[in-house]
């Protein structure tokens, strides 16, 4: 039942998010953070942001079930593409996730969803670095490392490239899902 509902919702979201051609081509991007088998017949890509309320609602209501029933058993490959819809705070979260490494990437994103209110409020007050440091600290990333991560040109370039690529495909909001 869940799969039918998810598939219907994803198709609707994917079509709604597509450009004029009505189709978004799913191309692997170097450095994609993925879960599940690399050679899975089904790939689900989420363009998401840990500061997006809609992304948080999806994450809170469906993420664990999707992992348990489809990703962990190897039925699908899931890719989270960092879409910095809210600018610097999202980019900072993504930088911390990238610096945590492949094995901790999704754990950092999960934690950022849990801390969404604090991260957004700190950003609005101009003190995002304090919350980014707290996020990093949870994953043994020092304040100096967080600073280095958020200034890492390769990470910044990837975040900008994902956003540009997404917008080139007509994807302008989060969460947007693309299913092959």
Regions found by a protein language model. Name each.
Residues 2-86, 160-163, 167:
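Extracytoplasmic thiol/disulfide redox context detector
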């Amino acid at each position: 039942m869940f799969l039918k509902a998810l598939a219907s919702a994803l198709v609707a979201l994917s079509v709604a998010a597509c450009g004029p051609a009505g189709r978004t081509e799913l191309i692997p991007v170097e450095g994609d953070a993925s879960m599940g088998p690399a050679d899975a017949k089904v790939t689900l890509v989420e363009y998401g942001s840990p500061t997006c309320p809609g992304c948080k609602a999806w994450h809170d209501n469906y993420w664990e079930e999707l992992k348990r029933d489809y990703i962990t058993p190897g039925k699908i490959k899931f890719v989270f593409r960092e879409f910095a819809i809210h600018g610097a705070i999202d980019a900072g979260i993504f930088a911390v996730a990238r610096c945590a490494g492949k094995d901790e990437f999704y754990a950092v994103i999960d934690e950022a969803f849990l801390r969404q209110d604090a991260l957004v409020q700190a950003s609005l007050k101009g003190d995002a670095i304090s919350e980014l440091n707290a996020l990093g600290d949870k994953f043994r990333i020092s304040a100096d490392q967080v600073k280095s991560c958020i200034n890492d040109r390769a990470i910044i370039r990837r975040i900008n490239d994902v956003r540009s690529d997404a917008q080139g495909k007509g994807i302008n909001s989060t969460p947007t899902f693309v299913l092959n």
